[in-house]
């Protein structure tokens, strides 16, 4: 038994160092043809309103860039103004950007200190300076509608979700009709939630992640939930309590959503954030299909995460995520769903 353990540790060490020593380009040679490289750097991809460009961050606390899908030309978006680091970028229905900025001044000793209290700003489409504050703070990623200017966000502390409309008055964006729609204030101290998407095509359901854990980690377990904005009914879409199932980008028809899950891991290796991306049916069955295998292909080093779906439902942008570091990664990839479906038929 001791020899087996030593062999396993040696093999893990070997694979880890091999993955770390490879470049993104060489790693790509191991992947199926329906993956293609967009960038060898950057993280947290976000499609624009026409699915012509992808916005992304250069690092966890950084600036926003965009890449044109056809030309692959990369340009800076937020280099025109000083800030304390941008953590989130989302594209609104009108093409303006919703930014999550961490404070007024950058602290190099603790760059992520404001990660869970981001100030909400609007940067108008085509502009590179003068973002406008909405006077609100959020934790993790907000949800935005693809058909109107409705947004929802998790209040810092991750115990409540608020919803509002963005209205432009004399060209200045403001929040209106603000209200709390979900509250966990009376729940266990180790229960959290996080917004993700309004469900197309009607936007009458908010898709979010329900977390629970313990004093050590409140996010060990997670399930994909839906909250009906008309009836108040809550639906569990994953039905897998012994694993991690964080919801990510939704498909434009509202029939599927992407999730990050560790359901492929043996039970003793679950709840350690060794995740990969899956396509989950939103029919209540809990059925999910794994679309990438980075966490087992490059164990203890890389995973696939942060998937977002374009407006046609044919392409998914995702990142090479680091196993050690929530949301962090390097390199953005394009997943061709038509090519993937064709490859399944050929098997």
Regions found by a protein language model. Give the residues of each.
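Positively charged n-region of N-terminal signal peptides that target proteins for export
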Residues: 1-4
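Bacterial Sec-dependent signal peptides at the C-terminal "C-region" and cleavage site
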Residues: 15-23
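Sequence signature of WD/YWTD-type beta-propeller architectures
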Residues: 22-347
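Bacterial N-terminal signal peptides
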Residues: 7-16
């Amino acid at each position: 038994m001791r020899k087996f353990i030593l062999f396993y540790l040696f093999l893990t060490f070997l694979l880890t160092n091999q993955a770390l020593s490879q470049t993104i380009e060489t790693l790509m040679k191991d992947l199926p043809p329906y993956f293609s490289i967009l960038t060898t750097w950057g993280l947290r991809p976000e499609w624009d309103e026409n699915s012509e460009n992808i916005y992304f961050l250069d690092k966890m606390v950084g600036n926003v860039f965009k890449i044109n899908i056809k030309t692959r030309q990369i340009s800076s978006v937020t280099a025109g103004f000083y800030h304390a680091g941008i953590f989130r970028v989302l594209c609104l229905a009108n093409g303006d950007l919703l930014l999550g900025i961490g404070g007024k001044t950058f602290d190099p000793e603790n760059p992520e200190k404001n990660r869970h209290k981001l100030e909400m700003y609007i940067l108008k489409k085509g502009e590179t300076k003068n973002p406008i504050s909405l006077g609100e703070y959020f934790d993790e990623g907000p949800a935005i509608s693809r058909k109107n200017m409705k947004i929802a966000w998790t209040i810092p502390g991750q115990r409540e979700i608020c919803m509002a409309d963005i209205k432009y008055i004399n060209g200045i964006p403001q929040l209106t009709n603000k209200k709390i729609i979900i509250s966990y204030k009376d729940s266990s101290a180790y229960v959290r939630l996080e917004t993700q998407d309004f469900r197309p095509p009607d936007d009458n359901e908010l898709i979010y992640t329900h977390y629970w854990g313990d004093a050590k980690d409140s996010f060990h377990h997670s399930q994909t939930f839906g909250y009906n904005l008309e009836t108040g009914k809550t639906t569990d879409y994953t039905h897998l309590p012994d694993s991690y199932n964080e919801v990510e980008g939704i498909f434009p028809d509202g029939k599927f959503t992407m999730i990050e899950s560790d359901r492929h891991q043996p039970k003793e290796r679950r709840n350690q954030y060794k995740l990969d991306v899956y396509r989950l049916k939103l029919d209540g069955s809990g059925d999910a299909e794994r679309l990438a295998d980075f966490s087992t292909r490059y164990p203890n080093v890389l995973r696939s995460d942060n998937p977002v779906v374009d407006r046609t439902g044919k392409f998914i942008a995702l990142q090479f995520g680091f196993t050690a570091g929530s949301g962090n990664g390097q390199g953005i990839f394009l997943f061709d769903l038509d090519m993937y479906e064709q490859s399944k038929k050929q098997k």
